[in-house]
Structures are given as structure tokens and as C-alpha cells.
Amino acid sequence: MSVLVVGTVGIDRVETPHGERSDLLGGSASFAGLAASFHAPVSLNSVVGEDFPAHHRAIWEKRKIDLSGLQIAKGKTFRWHGQYEQNMNNRRTISTDLNVLADFQPLLSESQKKLPFVLLGNLTPDLQHSVLDQMQKPKFVVADTMNLWIDIARTRLLELLPRIDLLILNDSEATQLSDESNLVRAARWLRERGPRYVAVKKGEHGCFLAGPEGAFAAPAVPLEQVLDPTGAGDTFAGGLTGYLAGQKETNLSTLAQGVIEGTILASFTVEDFSLNRLASLTEKDIAARRRELLRLINPNP
């Protein structure tokens, strides 16, 4: 089944201890859409400006992602400039220029309204609601969020929870939204407010998944070098959702495997800047990384 991915597309400038790169393809929809395409057909909905480079668009086209929902608006594409500290866990935003993203309204085509799987990438809760208002009974809805929306749009975010099936957020965001310091209690608090499943990302410490059938935890893939963490969370969400779209059932078992697939793809994203590593991946690469991760989960299969 196909996945609708709605989110941001931007042009990034990234500084890390390993170097600086400019004019990179970025945005939640960019990473999530490409990751989901490894498991399912993807239809993208976002906005770019008249300055958006053709070579960035070609990255999606190579993966046969449907770009009919990519609006080209008059003006400049969303731009972000970020800097990572030495430990790569702390990031500082140097500048953000919303440009055409400031007026973005995700207008879905008739075909997009009927898609069974929806990934609401990192957008304002109002825009996430707008997407769901246009959908025709999707089978499974995944939503990602961030601390900014918890700070400035908490009520609208809480109103979104009953409308989705899976909420993805990191550990500090789960604590912030639930006011629970324990992640098990935080996930329970969140699930009581709507979503059947909650996936809590813990960075280099993996992911915790909670649902009505129980819980699952997966480690991160140990990496000797991380060049650029940008987009890792979006990649995780896209890989997970894409995997689910290829399954007959959506339950704890398939979501657990989805967590593994999302973790695998995210581990590649951080090995290079932007989508460079993800765009060059082969099925052989993914299979080898999957075996590596599964050995961590079950050392004696």
C-alpha cells in the first residue's frame, strides 16, 4: 500500500565537528519520504520555492516518489542553518528563513486523500489537523512532533492524539508533553489520550515502543563515526511507516519490525551529510545492517 508523506522541504546549511556543507536537501518530508520509499510507494506533499534545485528533485525521482503534490510557490525555499556541538547530541539553530513555508497549506489531490497510510511529518499541529480533515478514512496515521509545538501549540497537539494511530517523539519531548519522567509512564499517559501506539526515540540508546499488546525496545546501531545527525528522526519515521504499509497487519509485532527498519535506515543517514548516504543505499547494504542489528537484539538466533 502507498504512503502519503506530508512535511517540510528545505535547503540546509549544516556545521558539524566533521565539516560544513551548504545548499543541502533537508526538511522532514525529504528524509521521511526517501526512507519510506525503500518499503512502499510514496506520494509527497510539501512546498518549495522557485529556487529549488533540479538536482535535489532528482533524488526523489530516482526512487520513483510521486511529486504531484509538491507545490512550487512564488518565492524562495525554506532554509535552515544549524550547528552541532562536539558530542553531536546538542544542536544550535543559527538561522531559519521560512520563506514559502510560511504560507504553506497542504492541499491534497483526490488520489492523495484516498491513500491508506499517512505520515504527518514535523509540521504545526494545525497543518497536521488540516491534512487529516482532507483524508478519506486512512487505515493508519503516524504523526511526528517536536518540543516547539509542545511549547506553543500544546492544546492543538493534544487534540491531534485521538486522530492518530502512532505518535513518534523523542524522550525529552515525551517527558515534556506528559510531565512524566519515566518513559513507561510517559508512553502510557500519551496512549491514554488517543494513539494506540507510541514510539519514543532515545537517540544513540535506541527506541521504546508501547502499545495495547505490550512493549518493545530496540537498540541503536553502534557506529564508529557520525557525520551529520540531521534528519535521522525523520528517516526513522519514514522507514517505520513505509514498512507498515507493506504489511497485512498493523500490530505490535509489525510495528516492532518497523522500528527495526526505521532504525536501520536512520543509522545510514547519520553516516554522511543530508541524504547523501540514504540516496546511495542498496538492498544489500540494508540487509547487512539488518543482520548486524538483529545480532544485537538476539545474539544467539
Regions found by a protein language model. Give the residues of each.
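Alpha-helix C-terminal capping segments
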Residues: 32-42, 243-245
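A short acidic, amphipathic alpha-helical/loop segment
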Residues: 56, 127-134, 155-159
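Short, conserved phosphate/pyrophosphate- and ester-handling motifs at nucleotide-, phospho-/glycolipid
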Residues: 36, 170, 233
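Conserved phosphate/ATP/ADP-binding segment of small-molecule kinases
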Residues: 136-140, 147-217
